[in-house]
Amino acid sequence: SEKILPGSGLEHESLDTTHFSVADKNGNIVSNTYTLNSGFGSGVVIDGTGILMNNEMDDFVSAPGVPNQFGLIGGEANKIEPFKRPLSSMTPTIILKEGKPIYATGSPGGSRIITTVLQFLLNTLVFKMEISDATVAPRIHHQWKPDVLMLETGFDIQHASKIESLGQKIYF
């Protein structure tokens, strides 16, 4: 960890986000997503605790139109200013039915969290897939900038070829 300096980024999105959902016998549900944002967070450890500080400040735009460490391009609305929260993809979700919690989910995955959670919910609640099948189902992701459709391994190649023939850039 001595080689990791504050603000150091990783070449690829890291595995430093986690999500957990828990429920108790009384029907209380928690959906929690936590992130360091990149390997070793900001690289700053609170003296005497071993606690790493995250680097969520990277979720702000340092300059409109300039990509952050994950290649996300932000605009004027997400620039750093006092009393603001940065745009975040974290999507801890609790589904209610008649005012009572019935379902909790979320995911790690950086910019892909929102589309991952949406596709998981569609697969389980609308298409009635088993949770285990929905968890491993290949997903698609597009975030506007960069204009690339990301397809996970296992996505039907024939569908991908058809989409590509329409002029859409695809990344597997």
Label every PLM stretch briefly.
Residues 1-6:
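Amphipathic alpha-helical
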